[in-house]
Amino acid sequence: PQICVLLERSLASQISQGSITHLSIAFRLSTIMMSITVASFIVPIYANLERMSGADKRDFWRVIAGHLSWISLLILPSCSIFLALSEEITRFLFLRGEFEEADVLATAAALKSYIFGVPFMCLILIFTRALLALRAALYPVVAAGMMLLSYLVLVYGVELNDSVELLAAAFSFAQFICASVLFGFLLFQLEWRTVMENMNYKFIISLVFASIAIYYFLYFWPFRSYIGLAFGGGITTLFFAAIAFRWRKSRRT
């Protein structure tokens, strides 16, 4: 992620005066929720994952799913508040001196794009720690490489580099790619069937709300028709597969 941040700041210097400041302020504001979440939930998860790494795979996944449910209940409302009040928060904190109204709007636009990446930052931390607990240290390295590659494709291939809002959006989407890759590796380590059979209803509900949020995020992108279709189909398949496995499990018991 830090490499992406450096590239982002370098590209921002080529847009307009003050772009680096807008991105830096927006990024710092977005990390406030991240800091609260890490201090409150993610750090205690690390100890539980290390303790449960030698247990049954189903028990290990139940620990992950349980913590993800509680984190989603905290982080999603916080993200919604920041999205709704991004301009007001930026204006209250920084509208003084040479920081004018145009700077407020640019910073708030970047903040909105960064906010969508905050849940995926949390997932990256949790999935990485889970894979390390399972002695699969190579997978997080591969996922980080995929994140950097996807960011480069977005800013240079799709040319999302002509505004601070698009640069921040590319950074958030790269985090989404990284979290998805890590989740795929975790499914591979725990066996896909084990994970699907042990999804509780809170995790499924949080998955649905997260998919709705991501869909609306992708709706504003230039290539929304392609990504929205693929993501919507994938998340729908995953949701109904989880329901089917839980139904079959209840029938057996």
Segments from the language model and where they lie:
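Membrane-interface junctions at transmembrane-helix termini in multi-pass inner-membrane proteins
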Residues: 116-146, 157
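Interfacial/gating helices of multi-pass transporter permease domains
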Residues: 12-34, 102-108
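Transmembrane alpha-helical segments of multi-pass transport proteins
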Residues: 198-252
